[in-house]
């Protein structure tokens, strides 16, 4: 998931005069020697095709693409081979018992600069600092922010200070660091990358927690300068989850959020070890390989899909349906939000999607099948469109433009993001949570389960046909949903889940949730009400899908404990700490 928030955009915009400036294809003043892509390459990246129909009558499935090889070599950590649905992949397990290897992984690094204090910034800065202290390393973790900003004060409260040399100005921190973790908002990265690159030391390492910047550069025919390495470590969850599970796992050899890692360019042979060290220091239970391009496509797509936008659309659509059909508001909320974020998520997390179906009675299975059959292809239609909007660069441009609308310009007012939890449904949710017994996971409501699992399976199928690895597919479609994000909606509602995430994720959820709500209401639910027959081929394919075995393998690698989101959570975004139930 993207590792940024809009507060960082404000910090960068105040420090740079390049914000919102049209981007040129070359930068003579700083002589950064960008690699320019050929017109043929650019056209190839933007091409859109259609493929086989998967037996559907309305929607063609995405064309099948063969996964790229993601093998890697490390001289510091142990690489393990896993088999996921017949595909061999490689991972590195984490754990506090590996912290003593961090000095070797970070060889040649004296200072790690963490730029930004949004969703991921606080978590990553604190986790890295604490892990390096435990490893008895003298590497300095320094946070770079705009002086005088509210974020500067928040970083002080987290134990970083100018006096200790662990807090400073953005640009001096970039210039003085050997590894720079760029965790500002994606739109701020897109508007300020020229200045950022010019401040990096030669042979330093630029670390990203999202491949968005690569996607933006590709969309304008550019690549990174060749005088520094570029790596990525991308936690599969929001920043507050990364920190919370790290703290919870201190007594049990660590727990945290799984991460993907990628090496885009390596100027001196250190990049893989540094990336894996970064991931282990964050507390990742396991780390799997990807590329920056595959990461940004799956990540931006995933958060608009089942991770945030789609699940929001599902519960809005079903709550409205249930109440219109005579169900009480409280029960409708329990049978939508509480069901998905409680028992359904818990079951999928520990036993997989098939266990949800198998836990139902025979009548319950029929309700599940009816909902699944009617929802699968409408869900895929929007998911397919969303993926291709991301892959073509359209969604990336949308994020950049939205970030610029946060500020007054061209005589038009600023348009910050609005609230998403002020409707009747979410007020009902406050009442339901206020009387919910501790540990209550809600009812396993078959129809809701059928729609939710259909969305999850449709997302898996799109990513599979687009050539993503099973580890990436399962993390972006299943694990992040049930282990990192849904627990936050269970705790305090949809805004507490969505708005603890990055700016890119928050924008995408707001944009795409209504699309899923609409298509479910207009197509899936209408099909159910009209008595459309259950597509037994879809049900058979679901029951026998090889992804279930792959999920079981990944479940064995999940965090060693479940995330706890208490009422007085102090590890979330400050503006969300004092919200109501």
UniProtKB/Swiss-Prot annotation:
Binding site for Mg(2+) 1: 299, 303
InterPro entries (alphabetical): 6-PGluconate_DH-like_C_sf, 6PGD_dom2, KARI, KARI_C, KARI_N, KetolA_reductoisomerase_plant, NAD(P)-bd_dom_sf
Active-site annotation: 210
Pathway assigned to this chain's UniProt record: Amino-acid biosynthesis; L-isoleucine biosynthesis; L-isoleucine from 2-oxobutanoate: step 2/4; Amino-acid biosynthesis; L-valine biosynthesis; L-valine from pyruvate: step 2/4
Transit sequence range: 1-50
Record's GO cellular component terms: chloroplast; mitochondrion
GO biological process: isoleucine biosynthetic process; L-valine biosynthetic process
Cofactor(s) in the UniProt record: Mg(2+)
Binding sites annotated in the UniProt record for NADP(+): 113-120, 146-151, 185-189
Disulfide bonding pattern of the chain: none
Annotated residues for binding of substrate: 502
KARI C-terminal knotted domain segment(s): 291-439, 440-576
Similarity comment: Belongs to the ketol-acid reductoisomerase family.
PANTHER family registered for this protein in UniProt: KETOL-ACID REDUCTOISOMERASE, MITOCHONDRIAL
Name of this chain's protein: Ketol-acid reductoisomerase, chloroplastic
Source species of the chain: Pisum sativum (Garden pea)
Gene encoding the protein: PGAAIR
